[in-house]
């Protein structure tokens, strides 16, 4: 079982006299920077000179520098850039400014685990990964609570990497909800698996296939959308709040019996084998290699799939339905 650390077990001592550079000011970046700053820690933000976020970060009361300047000024450097951009920025702007005893931090282990970034041996390397999007990390912090987070130490050059990681997650509010210790390998492989197999890939494919099945059978697309997509949130919220048991307890007996008897026929042994194959490709690095190569040529496959998704009938119908629901929260975190 994972070890869980709470607020009363941690202090800010390991970061008290250090400067923390947050590289990036997107969804996670703005939340980390503002939470750490409001926790009384010394925070700077590293951005490109041309970044539209420069003025935003300054307006939020933060000191902003270029990435290279921030790396040179900082003791702890948290890289909160897209996975595919991290290595190039690291080698061109961060690595030349690293000093022995500095700490490199990540919110996801992809680049370290798959050796896209190979840090020098004389710096600490740790992970601080909140299990929620940036706007939730920020909102819950301001409410006096927080979201759970993961920590991991990949390299402990100073002998103090774990304490720095714990002070960091305390600063973003995560210890209020509980912090779980893991490894870079475990976080990376389980995170990618979840994204691909159920949270993003599996769920979206299940929704689209169910929608297409109803429409092909002659049902109105609007009815198909409500039953296969719109109501997903109702079910997911129940699971999020109380697990599968809460969900089964809350739905009708008809839904419970039908779901329990038919569900295993849909997600069956063939599906399980496909999941094992997806996990194998994550573990052996095949997926990482494919993704890195795709990024090197500016993501042509991803862009084509995004266009196809946007044109899918489910998306067209869904957009029309959502436009007619005035109370629906349509806030999108573009970052």
From Swiss-Prot:
Recorded metabolic or biological pathway in which this protein acts: Amino-acid biosynthesis; L-isoleucine biosynthesis; L-isoleucine from 2-oxobutanoate: step 2/4; Amino-acid biosynthesis; L-valine biosynthesis; L-valine from pyruvate: step 2/4
Keywords assigned by UniProt, alphabetized: Amino-acid biosynthesis, Branched-chain amino acid biosynthesis, Magnesium, Metal-binding, NADP, Oxidoreductase
Residue ranges annotated for the KARI C-terminal knotted domain, each copy included: 183-328
Necessary cofactors: Mg(2+)
Any one GO molecular-function label of the UniProt entry: NADP binding
Binding site for Mg(2+) 1: 191, 195
Record-linked InterPro entries: 6-PGluconate_DH-like_C_sf, KARI, KARI_C, KARI_N, KARI_prok, NAD(P)-bd_dom_sf
Residues of the KARI N-terminal Rossmann domain: 2-182
Presence of keyword Metal-binding: yes
Reaction it catalyzes: (2R)-2,3-dihydroxy-3-methylbutanoate + NADP(+) = (2S)-2-acetolactate + NADPH + H(+); (2R,3R)-2,3-dihydroxy-3-methylpentanoate + NADP(+) = (S)-2-ethyl-2-hydroxy-3-oxobutanoate + NADPH + H(+)
Tree of life domain: Archaea
UniProt binding sites for Mg(2+) 2: 191, 227, 231
Coiled coil (residue ranges): none
Cofactor binding note: Binds 2 magnesium ions per subunit.
Cited PROSITE patterns: KARI_C (PS51851), KARI_N (PS51850)
Binding residues for NADP(+): 25-28, 48, 51, 53, 83-86, 134
Active-site residues, Swiss-Prot/TrEMBL: 108
Binding site for substrate: 252
GO BP terms: isoleucine biosynthetic process; L-valine biosynthetic process
Enzyme Commission code(s) on record: 1.1.1.86
Covalent S-S links between cysteines: none
PANTHER family in alphabetical order: KETOL-ACID REDUCTOISOMERASE, MITOCHONDRIAL
Family: Belongs to the ketol-acid reductoisomerase family.
Free-text function comment from the UniProt entry: Involved in the biosynthesis of branched-chain amino acids (BCAA). Catalyzes an alkyl-migration followed by a ketol-acid reduction of (S)-2-acetolactate (S2AL) to yield (R)-2,3-dihydroxy-isovalerate. In the isomerase reaction, S2AL is rearranged via a Mg-dependent methyl migration to produce 3-hydroxy-3-methyl-2-ketobutyrate (HMKB). In the reductase reaction, this 2-ketoacid undergoes a metal-dependent reduction by NADPH to yield (R)-2,3-dihydroxy-isovalerate.
The protein's name in its UniProt record: Ketol-acid reductoisomerase (NADP(+))
Organism lineage string: Archaea, Methanobacteriati, Methanobacteriota, Stenosarchaea group, Methanomicrobia
């Amino acid at each position: 079982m994972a070890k869980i650390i709470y607020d009363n077990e941690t202090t800010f001592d390991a970061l008290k006299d250090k400067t923390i550079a947050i590289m990036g000011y997107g969804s996670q970046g703005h939340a980390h920077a503002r939470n750490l700053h409001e926790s009384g820690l010394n925070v700077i933000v590293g951005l490109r000179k041309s970044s539209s976020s420069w003025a935003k970060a300054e307006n939020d009361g933060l000191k902003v520098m270029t990435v290279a300047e921030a790396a040179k000024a900082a003791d702890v450097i948290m890289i909160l850039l897209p996975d595919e951009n991290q290595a190039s920025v690291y080698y061109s702007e961060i690595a030349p400014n690293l000093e022995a005893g500095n700490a490199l931090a990540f919110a996801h282990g992809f680049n370290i685990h798959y050796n896209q970034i190979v840090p020098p041996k004389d710096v600490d390397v740790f992970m601080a990964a909140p299990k929620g999007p940036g706007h939730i990390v920020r909102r819950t912090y301001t409410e006096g609570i927080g979201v759970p987070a993961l920590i991991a130490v990949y390299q402990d050059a100073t002998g103090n990497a774990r304490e720095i990681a714990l002070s960091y997650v305390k600063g973003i509010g995560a210890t209020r909800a509980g912090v779980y210790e893991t490894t870079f390998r475990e976080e990376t492989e389980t995170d990618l698996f979840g994204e691909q197999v159920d949270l993003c890939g599996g769920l979206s494919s299940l929704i689209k296939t169910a929608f297409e099945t109803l429409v092909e059978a002659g049902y109105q697309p609007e009815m198909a959308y409500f039953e296969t997509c719109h109501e997903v949130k109702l079910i997911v919220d129940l699971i999020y709040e109380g697990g599968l048991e809460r969900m089964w307890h809350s739905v009708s007996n008809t839904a419970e019996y039908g779901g329990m008897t038919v569900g295993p026929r849909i997600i069956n042994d063939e599906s399980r084998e496909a999941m094992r194959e997806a996990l194998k490709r994550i573990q052996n690095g095949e997926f990482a290699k494919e993704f890195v190569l795709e990024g090197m040529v500016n993501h042509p496959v991803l862009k084509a799939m995004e266009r196809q998704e946007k044109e899918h009938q489910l998306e067209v119908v869904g957009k029309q339905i959502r436009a007619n629901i005035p109370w629906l929260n349509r806030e999108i975190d573009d970052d």
